[in-house]
Every structure is written in structure tokens, then in C-alpha cells.
């Protein structure tokens, strides 16, 4: 189990996939022994064997029910305390088979691009394999004679899903069953990076040949207003993860990439950063000063821009000179130049720039 004495903010938790596998394993034990256990040891995808508390265990001659309450540790996860529930029933005519199904609160896949069957449950590949492995580990004797259907459900999962990107990805009616290791690390960016990649993959299946990458909610709202002809799934909030978004676009064969952002993140992209988090690299104000000088800004303004720490300051000084649009256009052009160097002949590129109120300032080309 997790270390309850870990320093605040560092306690790990378990994924929805791990909890589903534990519930399924407990239910199968119930079918084998006639009693669902109060605790179960479950093998996680990373190879760890972990003990879970089991709730609401029930069993009859042909089915069993078990539930595991998710503990996300110190991660602020909307699925923390979710009831991952497994209902397992015998399939007399399908000896040796384990059939995975989605119940209430588990989303249904409605769009291609996720590596999951359209119309099927949103249970990702690693959790699928892990659930089946745990079922087979304790149900081998049963599977010699019958098959087993394992239905995973999550009460209140549809409400939880409203706090996720599932609807944007075409996953409707509930949450996804996720987890590549079985462990949730507090404030980990892995889940968000994965959602960015999935979003780009879905955009690649829409037939428009374009993905619109934005740095956040305000920039996305701005770009959506600029490009109303595109459906919502064509827009992906990449946050700080340009590298992963662009890599996914290459793999998806997308030929046009539109980037929407504000001066700070765009400056980092222009200077060659592909992870634009504030803690990763400082803004290259020298680059901004050079752009300003190229537009005829006085030397004292260029020196002030170079000596300041923020890109916003540069924009404000250029606005005061009446050169705001030209400055932001030059920055957008530099972003395109940098990305063309990094991804030669891969994409048609466009950059849209907005201010801190979400109003359009400039675009390129």
C-alpha cells in the first residue's frame, strides 16, 4: 500500500486501471472460492504487487461483484475516491476467453484515433491487459471450462468526466480507465501529456488535415472564434507541451499546424524551446530586443526590453510606440522560422497571437 507517512504533497496513489484490475481480481476470486475477499493483492503493470481493500463483495453461482475505492494519493485528480466496480459473470460457451466490457460511468469511444475500437469502452490498452492478466492469474481453473465477462463501471463517472477532456476526444458518457504503470504520481504531467497526444491523434482523423494547438483556455477561445469552420476536436490545448503535440502531428500525418498563443509562450517557441513551462527556461529578451530594433525602435527602448525579464514588457513598450502589431507579427514569423528549422518540410504553419484579454493582435504568415 501507499506510504501514509510520506511528506505532504508526495504521496502516490493508484490509477483507475489498477483499481479496476484489483476489483476484477477480487470478483473472480469470489467466483472461484464462493466468497469475495475483503482485501486482494493485485499485480500492477509496473510489476508491483499491491494490496487493495475490497468493498461490497457479492457472489452467486454465476456472477460476482467487487468494488475498490480509488486513492489518488496527493494528486488533485477528479477520480479520487471513485468506486471502481467489477461485475464478473460466467460465459458457458466461451471457454478460455476473457471479455472486457464497460458499464455505467465508463466512457464510450465514438471517434477513431485513440487506439481503441469505436463503440467500445474507453479502457486503455495497458489497463485492458492488466485486468485480463489478473483475471487469468486467479481464474485459470474456471477458464478451463468457461469464459468470463468482466464489466467495469464507475458510479458518478459521467459527472467526473465533465472535468476531463473526454468529450473533446469523443469519449462520451463517462471517464476513461487509464494508467501505464498503475501508480499516480502527485502533480505529474504525464497524464496531461498523454491527453495532448490523444487530442492530436483524434484531430488527425477528422479529414481536415489541420490541428490547432493552443497554450491554454483563453488562447483556445480566441482561436476558435478566428476559425469557426473547424470542429471542436480540431483544437488541442497543448499547454507547455509543444514537443509532444508536434511529434504526434508528424505521426498522424497532419500537414497544417496552427498555433495560437500570447507573447510569453510564443517567445519561448521562437527561441527554440519545445517545453515552454516557466521553470524550464528564461524568456530570451535579447531576441525580443533584436526584433524591436529591426522595426526601428529607439536604442533606449531596445536596451530596456533586453534588460527586462518578461516578454509582456516588450509588447507593452512596442505598443506605446505604435509598433505593437508589427512587433507581434515579427514574433509570429520568428516562431514559424524556428519551427520550419526543427520540422523541415513537415507542415504548413500559421501563428495567431492574442493579448492577455484574448483579443487578436497579429498573425503570420
Curated annotation (Swiss-Prot):
Can you state which reaction this protein catalyses?
Co-precorrin-5B + S-adenosyl-L-methionine = Co-precorrin-6A + S-adenosyl-L-homocysteine
Sorted alphabetically, which InterPro entries does this protein's record hold? Answer: CbiD (IPR002748), CbiD_sf (IPR036074)
One BP term from GO: methylation
GO MF annotation terms: cobalt-precorrin-5B C1-methyltransferase activity
As recorded in UniProt, its EC number(s) are 2.1.1.195
Top-level taxon of origin: Bacteria
Q: Which UniProt keywords apply?
A: Cobalamin biosynthesis, Methyltransferase, S-adenosyl-L-methionine, Transferase
Q: Does the keyword Protein transport apply?
A: no
Which pathway does the protein contribute to? Cofactor biosynthesis; adenosylcobalamin biosynthesis; cob(II)yrinate a,c-diamide from sirohydrochlorin (anaerobic route): step 6/10
Describe the family membership recorded for this protein in Swiss-Prot or TrEMBL: Belongs to the CbiD family.
Concerning PANTHER family, the annotation shows: COBALT-PRECORRIN-5B C(1)-METHYLTRANSFERASE
UniProt name for this protein: Cobalt-precorrin-5B C(1)-methyltransferase
* Organism, scientific name: Variovorax paradoxus (strain S110)
Amino acid at each position: 500500500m501507499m506510504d501514509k507517512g510520506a511528506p505532504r504533497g508526495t504521496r502516490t496513489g493508484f490509477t483507475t486501471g489498477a483499481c479496476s484490475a484489483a476489483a476484477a481480481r477480487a470478483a473472480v476470486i469470489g467466483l472461484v472460492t464462493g466468497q469475495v475477499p475483503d482485501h486482494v493483492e493485485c499485480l500492477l503493470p509496473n510489476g508491483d504487487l499491491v494490496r487493495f481493500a475490497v468493498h461490497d463483495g457479492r457472489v452467486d453461482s454465476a456472477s460476482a461483484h467487487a468494488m475498490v475505492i480509488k486513492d489518488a494519493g496527493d494528486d488533485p485528480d477528479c477520480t479520487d475516491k471513485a468506486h471502481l466496480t467489477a461485475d464478473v459473470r460466467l460465459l458457458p460457451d466461451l471457454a478460455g476467453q476473457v471479455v472486457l466490457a464497460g458499464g455505467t460511468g465508463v466512457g464510450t469511444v465514438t471517434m477513431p484515433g485513440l487506439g481503441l475500437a469505436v463503440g467500445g469502452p474507453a479502457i486503455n490498452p495497458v489497463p485492458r491487459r492488466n485486468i485480463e492478466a489478473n483475471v487469468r492469474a486467479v481464474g485459470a481453473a474456471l477458464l478451463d471450462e468457461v469464459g468470463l465477462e468482466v464489466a467495469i463501471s464507475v458510479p458518478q463517472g459521467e459527472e467526473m468526466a465533465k472535468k476531463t477532456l473526454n468529450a473533446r476526444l469523443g469519449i462520451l458518457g463517462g471517464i476513461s480507465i487509464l494508467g501505464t504503470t498503475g501508480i499516480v504520481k502527485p502533480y505529474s504531467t504525464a497524464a496531461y501529456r498523454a491527453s495532448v497526444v490523444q487530442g492530436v491523434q483524434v484531430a488527425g482523423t477528422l479529414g481536415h488535415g489541420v490541428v490547432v494547438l493552443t497554450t491554454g483556455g483563453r488562447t483556445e477561445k480566441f482561436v476558435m472564434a478566428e476559425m469557426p469552420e473547424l470542429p471542436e476536436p480540431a483544437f488541442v490545448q497543448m499547454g507547455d507541451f509543444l514537443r509532444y503535440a508536434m511529434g504526434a502531428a508528424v505521426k498522424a500525418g497532419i500537414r497544417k499546424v496552427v498555433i495560437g498563443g500570447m507573447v510569453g509562450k510564443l517567445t519561448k517557441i521562437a527561441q527554440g524551446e519545445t517545453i515552454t513551462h516557466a521553470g524550464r527556461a528564461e524568456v530570451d529578451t535579447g531576441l525580443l530586443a533584436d526584433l524591436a530594433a529591426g522595426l526601428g525602435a529607439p536604442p533606449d527602448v531596445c536596451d530596456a526590453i533586453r534588460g527586462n525579464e518578461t516578454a509582456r514588457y516588450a509588447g507593452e513598450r512596442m505598443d506605446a510606440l505604435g509598433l505593437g502589431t508589427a512587433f507581434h507579427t515579427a514574433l509570429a514569423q520568428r516562431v514559424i522560422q524556428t519551427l520550419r528549422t526543427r520540422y523541415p518540410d513537415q507542415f504548413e504553419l500559421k501563428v495567431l497571437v492574442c493579448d492577455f484579454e484574448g483579443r487578436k493582435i497579429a498573425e503570420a504568415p
